[in-house]
Each structure stands twice: as C-alpha cells, then as structure tokens.
Amino acid sequence: MSKLLQPLKFNCGLEMKNRFMLAPLTNTQSHSDGVLSEEEFNWLEMRAAGGFGLTMTCAAHVQAIGQGFPGQLGVFSDAHLKGLTKLAGAIKSHGSIAICQIHHAGIRSPKELVGEQPVG
C-alpha cells in the first residue's frame, strides 16, 4: 500500500507524483461536434485537483465518422485545440499528467450519429 503514494518515473522522463490514475470514463459531456464542454473540463480538472498522478480523458474520436456515442470528445479538428490545450494546462497545473485516450468506433459507429455508413 505504501507504494501508491510514491512517485513513478517512466523511461521517457515523465514522472507521476503518485500511482493513482484516473481511468478513461465515458461521460458523454462534450458538444455534438466533439468540442470540449465546460462541464467536462470542470469534471476532469476536479479529478486532477483531487490528487490523481495521471488524469485520462474519455475515449476521444480521431475522425468524425469514427464517433461511437453522443457527447464524445473529439481530437480530429483544429476546432478542438483550444479546449484540449486549456484542459491539458489545467490538469498539469495540479501536478497530474494529462493523457488523452484516442478512439475510432469503426463499424460500430452509429449511422444515425455520424450521418453515413460507418467504416469497417
């Protein structure tokens, strides 16, 4: 149990302040175009402020046609950069490592959500 509070250093040079990591949870709080919402920003920042050594976003789709669920965070457009940059800065300001889980739903992308036949 004592190791949980010890730092963890990765070969790449990053170091977690402790060994607590926020798993990528699907919270469906982003806007329909994948832009980070204030609610999702606040939720993730609160996790970092709470002491996680690593804070990971929900699954963020890398292509519009790869969206898997409504309210999914996007990382495929310049329109997403402002919110993602703000989020990374906020997470880091609490001493937590910011990680974005990337995702493509492929054939499981709902046609009614992406507007066309999914890739598969």
Predicted features and spans:
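Flavin-dependent oxidoreductase catalytic cores
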Residues: 1-120
